[in-house]
Amino acid sequence: EDVGMAYPQAIAIVKACVDTAMQLGLPEAQLPLAQAAVLLATAPKSNSVIEGIGAAWADVKAGKSGNFPRCLQNVHADSTGGAQGQNYKYPHAYPNHWVKQQYLPDELKNVQYYRYGDNKVERAAAQYWEAIKG
């Protein structure tokens, strides 16, 4: 949880180390486990995901969940006979696979839960995101 988005590939690497340790058994298992520990201890750190999910859960617990925008609901008739899923913009049909569209309920449409951390990976992601939004 401390490494997070600063080095997201660490999840797969540590899992591979644990799987390898399970297959090897002791005493050899200590090597991949030590490698995983050193990798995590020396990796850059980020708590941006923890902060974001914490803020999102706080809103849910405060009753700020609202209803999904109708364009994101499945296309079918709802209980009132109105069609749902209308006017959905398929992001992959747009340049850079992105289109401006409301994804959160009206009450939360301007809330930003994820904030990029100050590390190489997240700075690059932020730059990419700003570039594709134009």
Regions found by a protein language model. Name each.
Residues 1-96, 105-134:
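Terminal-proximal interaction/regulatory segments of ATP-powered molecular machines
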Residues 101-103:
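Short beta-strand elements
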